[in-house]
Amino acid sequence: MLAARTQGLGELPALVAVAVVLGWWTAATAVGEPSRRASSAPGADRSLPLAAEVVVGCRAVVPVAVLAVVLGVSALLVGQGAGSPLAWLALGVAVAPAWAGAAVRAGYRPDLDWSGPVVSSPMGALPTGVGATLVRGPDVGVLGTVPVGLALLLGAVPWWLVAVQLGWSAALAAFAVLTSGQPD
């Protein structure tokens, strides 16, 4: 729980914006768990009479629904002091497809490759590609949040920005789902 009281969005601390994005990341991780389990044990998905791409796309339906509620409510709370809470609610709902795509993309990311060289770290040995593996998925969600950042800078949500957010989120969600392949 993070509370910040300001006179308007122009005075919104950057920490609040970062905390909102981290909260959205956490919510996307939670709803992406079924995709991760399906990636680890793909037998059930393969038994369905659907193409693998269709199954992966279907795995984004529940995350979109859940994240539309979570992101919409949190954006509504951020915009309470702005005088246009419905516009902020619409913006939060419009960013949900990007985070749902991020959840599915993260769920189907490849496992770490321990057969290659490792890097020594204070936490022990790590494979060289650990960074690229860990950001696969959340990268789409953070990119999808760019119009929200623009709204924070503007201090308001014009309705054209909601349309841009929805189009941008849909494009990123399609990219995320299409690049999330079933493991062989």
Task: Please provide the spans of the model-predicted regions.
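Hydrophobic alpha-helical transmembrane segments of membrane proteins
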Residues: 1-46, 50-184
